[in-house]
Amino acid sequence: MTAPKPVVLCILDGWGLRAEREANAVALADTPTFDRLMATCPNATLVTHGPDVGLPRGQMGNSEVGHTNIGAGRVVAMDLGAIDLAIEEGSFPQNPALRDFIAKVKANGGTAHLMGVVSDGGVHGHIQHLISAVEVLAGEGIPVVIHAITDGRDVAPTSAGEFVGQLVRVLPEGARIGTVIGRYWAMDRDKRWDRVKRASDAMLHATGEHAPDAEAAVAAALARGETDEFIAPTVVGDYAGARDGDGFFCLNFRADRAREILAGLGQPGFDAYETGTRPDWSAFLGMVDYSKEHDRFMTAAYPKPVIRNTLGEWVASHGLRQFRIAETEKYPHVTFFLNGGREAPETGEDRYMANSPKVATYDLQPEMSAPDVSDHLVEAIGAGYDLIVVNYANPDMVGHTGDLKAAMAAVEEVDRGLGRAVEAVTTAGGAMIVTADHGNCETMVDPETGGPHTAHTTNPVPVILVNGPAGARLHAGRLADLAPTLLQLMQLPQPEEMTGRSLIDA
């Protein structure tokens, strides 16, 4: 029997399953295609959080973690757990890259600028990592300025006051908060350079709103109607900006939302916006590698391990063609993260990235660029590729806004695209796995507070086999099992590095 062609992996980003219908955008939306597939196709559920995806127990998954595990075909130990362990066992203060940073800043008589998300969401960073770094640097007698990035997305929308207060209470002598900035400005990933400029101007040049202290900055923002994610860049107290000889340390460990701000702060020749005169940094450090381009001007405390024989690499090694498609909000996920942290495409790997709409928040345009993604997906299905990976961003990106009606509209748009994909795959004689990388929009109200729920969830996600082998059944598993499943459908052997197991029971 010949292998189906193409084999499609359709990732409905942020589409989780929850039995209760209340505030559940997936259940409340009109989804005839998804409902039909669940009723007629082999299906099961996948775990997307905790140790099953290389995270600490109870820690919700996210798109970086999800796509890394999917592409690797094995459970990948993620940065959060590795850094937590280093702090817990006491090796963090002796990290070689951190020691080098300390030596250079000391030699230049500089201040250490620490930027990181101030929450315990654990998706992009963790407040405890920031606190630990402050303790180490202040303990070395280095003045410390913190650029506190408020979250409100991976945690409750108005919880920044608690986290900033927690940080303030443990600051050692010689450490202070210099700016408070919502992640909307400092953690963009879609080239909205006007936002990034406002964040970097506050850090570099002390321009923006002003507040006497960090807690007052959060309170003033709330009074202006800004929830944590959107707090306008605010200069705290008499902070006057960065100077030559200072060092910069980014505590966030997830690459996609750190790249732009780091480029604006330190990349030589950067010209996406006018930065003004930037300091001659004595040292520029990150928790992890952010990209090969970033490696040219900064070092990493915890370099990424090499993941060999990812799904894309293995398919390419067999001389087969593959196609990756998403809109730009999820560009890194179906490329960089799915390929194990490598930016360059594999041999025979083509890509299409639809431009995400330039709106302030995606509840204003919940369909996002899904119609464009669907058009190019259908075209690719008929173009002779062996493997296609597509990501629909809407359920996650609109779910993050906390707007239930908009999330329902997002889900319905994706369901329309899914319907087109099913028809095209069936016509072509291919097969498709429909799944998600984590949950989000199935929980739009926080059950504890009654307010909007904007974070990911630990709910299971669906996995559906469309137009698969006759008599096939699926069993429950985890994200690492998807690559082996796709390889089985493609009738390719599984590399020994992949320890996941196919979800298909013949």
Curated annotation (Swiss-Prot):
Q: Does the keyword Isomerase apply?
A: yes
Pathway in which the depicted protein is active: Carbohydrate degradation; glycolysis; pyruvate from D-glyceraldehyde 3-phosphate: step 3/5
Write down the EC number.
5.4.2.12
Q: Which GO terms describe its molecular function?
A: manganese ion binding; phosphoglycerate mutase activity
Set out the biological process GO terms recorded for this chain's protein: glucose catabolic process; glycolytic process
Which keywords does the record carry?
A: Glycolysis, Isomerase, Manganese, Metal-binding
Per UniProt, where does substrate bind?
124, 153-154, 183, 189, 254-257, 330
Q: Where does Mn(2+) 1 bind?
A: 396, 400, 456
Pfam families, sorted? iPGM_N, Metalloenzyme
Give the first-level EC class, as a single word: isomerase
Q: PANTHER family, from UniProt?
A: 2,3-BISPHOSPHOGLYCERATE-INDEPENDENT PHOSPHOGLYCERATE MUTASE
| Subunit comment | Monomer.
Return the protein name: 2,3-bisphosphoglycerate-independent phosphoglycerate mutase
Q: What is the lineage of its organism?
A: Bacteria, Pseudomonadati, Pseudomonadota, Alphaproteobacteria, Rhodobacterales
